Amino acid sequence: MLQPKRTKFRKVHKGRNRGIAVGTEVSFGTFGLKAIGRGRLTARQIEAARRAMTRAVKRQGKIWIRVFPDKPITEKPLEVRMGKGKGNVEYWVALIQPGKVLYEMDGVSEEIARHAFALAAAKLPMKTTFVTKTVM
C-alpha cells in the first residue's frame, strides 16, 4: 500500500479539507476519473480501486494514480481513557478537493475505460465522473 518512505513529523494536526483542487486536467493518459465531492481517500481505497481497474482492463493499457496518501491518521486503542497523548498512526490518507483527477488511463477503448472507472468508483467514498483529455 502507498505511504511515504519518510516524513518530517510522525503525527500531524487534523486540519480542514478546504480550498480548490490542483491537478484538475487529464495530463498523462487519455481518460480520467475526476472527483466531484470533497473527502479523503485511504491508501486501502486507492489500492482497491487500482486493482478493480487493472482486472477490468485485463492488464492492457496503462494506469496512472494521481493521488498519494501523505497524511497520517491516528487512533487510540479501544477502551482507553481520553488524554495521555495522541494515538498511534493507523493509516494514511490523501485529502481530495472537488475537481481533482484521481486516476488516468491510456491504451484502451473508451468503452473499456468507462467500465473500469465505474468499477473503481464503486470502491471510493466520494462521487466521481468520467473525463477525457481535452485537445486544444
UniProtKB/Swiss-Prot annotation:
Belongs to the universal ribosomal protein uL16 family. Keywords: Ribonucleoprotein, Ribosomal protein, RNA-binding, rRNA-binding, tRNA-binding. Part of the 50S ribosomal subunit. InterPro entries: Ribosomal_uL16, Ribosomal_uL16_bact-type, Ribosomal_uL16_CS, Ribosomal_uL16_dom, Ribosomal_uL16_sf. NCBIfam families: rplP_bact. Binds 23S rRNA and is also seen to make contacts with the A and possibly P site tRNAs. One of its GO terms (biological process) is translation. One of its GO terms (molecular function) is tRNA binding. It comes from the Bacteria. Signal peptide: none annotated. GO terms for cellular component: cytosolic large ribosomal subunit. This is Large ribosomal subunit protein uL16.
